[in-house]
Amino acid sequence: MHVIRETLKGGKGEVIKNPKVFIDPLSVFKEIPFREDILRDAAIAIRYFVKNEVKFSNLFLGLTGTGKTFVSKYIFNEIEEVKKEDEEYKDVKQAYVNCREVGGTPQAVLSSLAGKLTGFSVPKHGINLGEYIDKIKNGTRNIRAIIYLDEVDTLVKRRGGDIVLYQLLRSDANISVIMISNDINVRDYMEPRVLSSLGPSVIFKPYDAEQLKFILSKYAEYGLIKGTYDDEILSYIAAISAKEHGDARKAVNLLFRAAQLASGGGIIRKEHVDKAIVDYEQERLIEAVKALPFHYKLALRSLIESEDVMSAHKMYTDLCNKFKQKPLSYRRFSDIISELDMFGIVKIRIINRGRAGGVKKYALVEDKEKVLRALNETFEDSISIGDFDDVGEN
């Protein structure tokens, strides 16, 4: 009982000084290290757009945790501040959309953009793509709009996604676009007419161990109590994260989790970091599953029962019927499986059995137990474990 009281009060042995540093770093950090050149070039392009009506389109490319989203949101916030100081920026309107989080379809992305730019709710269904574009044009008339499309690869890999980009980039409205993608090959999915409208790609190189250590030292300085960590701990976390393509997001998450585990003990030790690594990998998979759109979850649940994609589609169709959802075609279902493979949740295998057996597509779910638990937690209000077990038995 007394332990709970001490924890609630944050007394003896506390490690974390300001958790907001880890949860909302943009509210604390006024500079972004190792990305100064990218920020300067982006600022110049934005200034030309606002003051000289020279439109731009940038594609931010880099692996997870290399600062693409952080830089984009930092730019967004800085523009909002400049609007208070410079009259020429007064009519600049911005819209940030994570394509995957809104569903990834052209309709969902355009609906979200139109809503943010017009200030009105725009339906995701029942409107053709041209009408969405018209709403966006009307919402940006006599102003300058900067659109941020995060995880844009989710959009361009969908049917019609290229049309959205082409319409936005070639629109006669005053719109400039910053696109963000973890998939460094995303341009391969774009049609030539879209590529011809794109500006140069901006590559975010992975952070090395020394850069990660510097970043961690800043988070520790602002977020942790002095004396609760040492240089060796920061170096250890930086070295681990540098091995995984220089992922700063992972490094910061590990430091925060290790600090939470050390709470009450007064100092972060190596065993706290090792435990944080295990927790991080589990949470990353679970959160990825929970963030999936509804039909992706049904597809994933079907794959747990059958690795054969054709058979899994039949089970998926049964699930859709059971829960009064219109099933997607096998082609679209197969596309979803490919996206799940891209997310690292499943691994696809193509087996050619010769002329007699043909080609069969299989998808192995990574860590079935954790994925199943995440699905059950997600569906606990609408779909029980028993509901899944009944599918296919009729």
Curated annotation (Swiss-Prot):
ATP binds at T66, G67, K68, T69, F70, Y207. It comes from the Archaea. CDD domains: Cdc6_C (cd08768), HLD_clamp (cd18133). Signal peptide: none annotated. InterPro entries: AAA_22, Cdc6_C, Cdc6_lid, ORC1/CDC6, Orc1/Cdc6_arc, P-loop_NTPase, WH-like_DNA-bd_sf, WH_DNA-bd_sf. GO terms for biological process: DNA replication. GO terms for molecular function: ATP binding; ATP hydrolysis activity; DNA binding. Keywords: ATP-binding, DNA replication, DNA-binding, Nucleotide-binding. Pfam families: AAA_22, Cdc6_C, Cdc6_lid. Induction: (Microbial infection) At least 4-fold induced following infection by Sulfolobus turreted icosahedral virus 1 (STIV-1) in strain 2-2-12. HAMAP family: ORC1_type_DNA_replic_protein (MF_01407). Strain 2-2-12 is a substrain of P2 that is highly susceptible to infection by Sulfolobus turreted icosahedral virus 1 (STIV-1). Involved in regulation of DNA replication. May play essential roles in origin recognition and cell cycle control of replication. Binds to DNA, with a preference for molecules that contain a bubble, a fork, or a tail. Inhibits the binding of the MCM helicase to the origin DNA and inhibits its DNA helicase activity. Also regulates the DNA polymerase and the nuclease activities of PolB1. Inhibits the DNA-binding activity of Cdc6-1 and Cdc6-2. Belongs to the CDC6/cdc18 family. PANTHER family: CELL DIVISION CONTROL PROTEIN 6 HOMOLOG (PTHR10763:SF26), CELL DIVISION CONTROL PROTEIN 6-RELATED (PTHR10763). Monomer. Interacts with Cdc6-1, Cdc6-2, MCM and PolB1. This is ORC1-type DNA replication protein 3.
